[in-house]
């Protein structure tokens, strides 16, 4: 059966970089991976563009494709599940999509899913400012997820990361937290373990 992992986070948090890194790591581990993004061009990857079944996709590595959202997310999920038969689908919704809304779409998509895991990517560099400026939305995005990945940990001091972690614990006490640098690849393996994918 198939697993779905959606990645929430504000614009600039590093979602696309992390998606590509996760896709490559998981396919190296023998998993068939499909990534759904709003626009393949944003991924900035080289690769043969595959125009199949109305989906514009790019092959990232052996066993890992990246597809542009085609019409509705439900439709895209159905096409990918039927034609590509992935072990894992990684979804990068827009920065303004709440995980709870995406969960509803997944539930009503008529695709058989073994597990649906949601991750919020928090930009360590901008977390405090984003929390102050968009408190209600930031809180809802954090509260509704299974795993929180604090990204860009290589750019901020340890005590700052601790403060962000305390804030996250207040908003979502039951979540697992991973410290990563998507750009450097640091902590990505630990994040995969926290997701329970491998």
Task: Please identify what each model-predicted range represents.
Residues 2-8, 13, 17-129, 136:
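Nucleotide-state-sensitive switch-loop elements of NTP-binding domains
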Residues 4, 81-85, 135-138, 162-168, ...:
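A general structural signal for short secondary-structure boundary/capping elements
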Residues 12, 95-96, 153-154, 183-184:
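Short beta->alpha junction loops/turns
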Residues 34, 114-122, 142-153, 171-181:
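Conserved beta-strand/loop subsegment of P-loop NTPase cores
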Residues 49-52, 141, 167-171:
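Short, conserved catalytic or adaptor-binding loops enriched in Gly and charged residues
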Residues 132-144:
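Flexible active-site lid/hinge loop adjacent to a nucleotide/diphosphate
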Residues 147, 154-198:
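Canonical P-loop GTPase G-domain recognition
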């Amino acid at each position: 059966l198939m697993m779905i992992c959606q990645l929430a986070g504000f614009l600039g948090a590093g979602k696309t970089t992390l998606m590509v890194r996760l896709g490559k790591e998981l396919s190296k581990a023998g998993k068939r991976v499909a990534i759904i993004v709003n626009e393949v061009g944003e991924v900035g990857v080289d690769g043969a563009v595959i125009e199949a079944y109305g989906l514009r996709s790019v092959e990232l590595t052996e066993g890992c494709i990246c597809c542009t959202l085609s019409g509705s997310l439900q439709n895209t999920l159905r096409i990918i599940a039927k034609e590509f038969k992935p072990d894992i689908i990684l979804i990068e919704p827009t920065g303004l999509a709440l995980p709870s809304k995406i969960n509803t779409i997944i539930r009503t998509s008529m695709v058989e899913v073994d597990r649906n895991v949601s991750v919020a990517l928090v930009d360590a560099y901008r977390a405090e400012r984003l929390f102050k400026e968009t408190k209600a939305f930031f809180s809802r995005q954090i509260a509704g997820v299974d795993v929180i990945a604090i990204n860009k940990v290589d750019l901020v001091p340890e005590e700052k990361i601790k403060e962000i972690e305390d804030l996250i614990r207040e908003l979502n006490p039951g979540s697992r937290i991973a410290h990563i640098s998507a750009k450097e690849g640091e902590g990505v393996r630990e994040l995969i373990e926290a997701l329970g994918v491998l």
